[in-house]
Amino acid sequence: MSIAALIDHTLLAPDVTAQHIRTLCREAVDHGFATVCVSPTRVRLAADELAGHAPRVCSVIGFPSGAHLSEIRAAETKAAVNDGADEIDMVINVGAVKDDDWDTVESDISAVVDAAGMAIVKVILEVSELTDEEITRACQAAERCGADFVKTSTGYSRHGATAEAVSLMRRTVGDRLGVKASGGIRTHNDVATMLRAGATRIGASAGVALLVDEEAL
């Protein structure tokens, strides 16, 4: 099976234009990517572009800092779903994790899960900022709150996915949740490493290049 069906084809830079989104969606259709992952303000355009096609629309929430109130996250999630988002990638409040304030962490996740309705929710942990114990507890919090996936990174922190973090996340959630690896995944070998570690979804802005790399093997 091609890796395309596992890839969230991602474009989250602040200077993204409507034409960039149209190109992203066309690439997703042409190559069979799982989703396009875009900012909330671009969800409606992406949903219109992908109407009648297989790739789904994923929106980030509380991105990239995670320093957002629960009610703001909920409102942002509802707006994204109303605009056509099928999947939601939310960022946890890393500062709350560091404060050992798990009530806030879980309140944020629950607010998004409740607002998302039937949409898939992925919880971004920002693993580069967390200890192994914090990664484990964050995964457990995501599962308790009803999330569907845990995800490594925003791509805006010190580093992205590592095989060690993905493996720890997989051991923690078992087969009950999906694991999405993202951040710094640029080659087919990177993808293979993450899949072996336990990832079931890949987030990448270099999706097309990954397929070219796959074909060259």
Curated annotation (Swiss-Prot):
Keyword terms of this UniProt record: Cytoplasm, Lyase, Schiff base
One Gene Ontology cellular component: cytoplasm
Protein's name in the database: Deoxyribose-phosphate aldolase 1
Catalyzed reaction equations: 2-deoxy-D-ribose 5-phosphate = D-glyceraldehyde 3-phosphate + acetaldehyde
Pathway(s) this gene product operates in, as recorded in its UniProt entry: Carbohydrate degradation; 2-deoxy-D-ribose 1-phosphate degradation; D-glyceraldehyde 3-phosphate and acetaldehyde from 2-deoxy-alpha-D-ribose 1-phosphate: step 2/2
Pfam families the record matches: DeoC
Enzyme class: lyase
Record GO biological process: 2-deoxyribose 1-phosphate catabolic process; carbohydrate catabolic process; deoxyribonucleotide catabolic process
Iron keyword on record: no
Gene3D superfamilies according to UniProt: Aldolase class I (3.20.20.70)
PANTHER family membership: DEOXYRIBOSE-PHOSPHATE ALDOLASE (PTHR10889:SF1)
NCBIfam families referenced in this protein's UniProt entry, alphabetically: deoC
Entry's family note: Belongs to the DeoC/FbaB aldolase family. DeoC type 1 subfamily.
GO MF annotation list: deoxyribose-phosphate aldolase activity
Gene from which the chain derives: deoC1
Role this protein plays: Catalyzes a reversible aldol reaction between acetaldehyde and D-glyceraldehyde 3-phosphate to generate 2-deoxy-D-ribose 5-phosphate.
Localization terms from the record: Cytoplasm
Organism: Cutibacterium acnes (strain DSM 16379 / KPA171202) (Propionibacterium acnes)
Residues annotated as catalytic: 89 (proton donor/acceptor), 151 (schiff-base intermediate with acetaldehyde), 180 (proton donor/acceptor)
EC number, UniProt record: 4.1.2.4
